[in-house]
Amino acid sequence: PYTGSGVLASALAMDKLCCKQMWQGIGLPTADFAVLDEQSNWPQIMQRLGGKAMVKPACEGYSIGLSRAETPEQMQQAWAEAARFAATVIAEPLMEGDEYTVAILGDQVLPSIRIEASEVFYDYQAKYFSDETQYFCPSGLTAERESELRELSMSAFKTVGCSGWGRVDVMVDNQGLFQLLEVNTVPGMT
């Protein structure tokens, strides 16, 4: 028996590419993305993603291998770094809005937490070592936006087949829309 999600849901949740494809397939919002490899057309991908991107291993956690790229050369370097951790590497447009994490316990969606990192982005250092990362609960969202985020988080969680408990991470894109990042089936309950 499991205290949370089973093996299949946990494996799916660990694969960011698979989750994004599942969410897109049912119309849930997740940022555009490109799968990168050594043959990638770096300038074309950078342009398609808006000129700035986050590059990450598709199957890694804790922001390991995550890099910001603002030029095609930086994207290629970021891909090489991320490829050290996973065979599949993805790039998404850089989203500079707020980051939220939403815990789910049984059928209850807990209040969202807004994360403010002093670093350029919420990386491994900011998550586990920085005394300057701040967590806000209540998150400051209006009741309507909080309800929207809670609904979205539960939909993302259930789409991946998760159960019991977990956490959904979301960012606000440059147009003010929520975009799903990932589901954590065994998270630290920040």
Where are the regions that the model predicts?
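Phosphate-binding site of ATP-dependent enzymes
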Residues: 70-151, 172-179
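Glycine-rich phosphate/pyrophosphate-binding beta-alpha loops
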Residues: 63, 118, 184-190
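Short beta-strands and strand-loop turn motifs
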Residues: 2-6, 55-60, 180
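Conserved metal-phosphate-binding beta-hairpin within the catalytic cores
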Residues: 93, 102, 157-189
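Short gly/pro/ser/thr-enriched loop/turn and capping motifs at secondary-structure boundaries
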Residues: 8-13, 119-120
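Short glycine/proline- and charge-enriched loop/turn segments
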Residues: 2-4, 128-133, 184
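Active-site nucleotide/adenylate-binding loops and adjacent lid/helix of ATP-dependent enzymes
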Residues: 11-98, 150
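Short hydrophobic/aromatic-enriched beta-strand-loop microsegments
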Residues: 1-5, 30, 111-112
